[in-house]
Amino acid sequence: MKGVILAGGIGTRLYPLTKVTNKHLLPVGKEPMIFNPIRQLISAGIVDILVVTGKDHMGEIVRLLGGGSDFKCRFTFKVQEKAGGIADALSLAEDFVGTDKFVVILGDNILTHSIREYVDAFKLQPRGARILLKRVGAPERFGVAALDEKNKMIIQIEEKPENPKSDYVVIGVYMYDPMVFEIICNIIPSDRGELEITSVNNWYVKNNMVLYDIIEGEWTDAGTFESLMQANQMLFSIDNNIVGG
């Protein structure tokens, strides 16, 4: 199984820091932010990893990561020429992934607990998608998963709703079969003109082809100054950046 890290975007919410570097290279704990999703994939046994990023800072990311020998993995790099949404960036992984199932992590997502058990469950899943949820105090900032009465199935995902139907949010770790690329080709751009990953996930929801897990450990994205500080506190509190099981 292969892994994809999406590390594009211009990081407007972290300006002016992102005027000089890609946000995924900012320090979180004792390492650059992108090291955490890399370690997550490796902890799940995934060592063939594609990194998708924008053209402005591609050179910095390649210089930092190299071919992957420092991590005992293999890196491939692709450029997203312009911001077109998470699903647009994901579409660039089609040739890399081929006909296999794969795992996607957003490069600003920081977790303290290994995703290995969830990836192992996905390996046994015959088809479809698997997404990870976390219960949070302010779900309206994220994509919110509405669950059925028995909490067995996701019935809808709403992006940043004013009145969330639950406090379970979809974190930036997604597992897909190769059908996802056909789905991306057929989704309609959002009002901001981007291909949204929520539209992709809702296709799987509507077709009863998605399972979910509620993650253990702590999680945050690091895309704002507040959440970047939270991510640093989170990793320094465990006194290391090694993903644990």
Feature names for model-found ranges:
Residues 67-72, 147-148, 203-205:
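Short, conserved catalytic or adaptor-binding loops enriched in Gly and charged residues
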Residues 2-5, 13, 27, 31-106, ...:
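Conserved N-terminal catalytic core of the sugar/cofactor nucleotidyltransferase
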Residues 131-133, 144-146, 173-175, 219:
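Conserved hydrophobic/aromatic beta-strand scaffold that supports enzyme active sites
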Residues 113-141:
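Conserved donor-nucleotide/metal-binding helix-loop-beta segment in metal-dependent transferases, i.e.
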Residues 19-24:
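Short alpha-helical oligomerization interface
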Residues 137, 145-153:
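Ligand/cofactor pocket segment of small-molecule handling proteins
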Residues 25, 145-147, 212:
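A structural signal for short hydrophobic beta-strand segments in well-ordered beta-sheet cores
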Residues 119, 123, 153-245:
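Catalytic-core segments of class I nucleotidyltransferases/pyrophosphorylases
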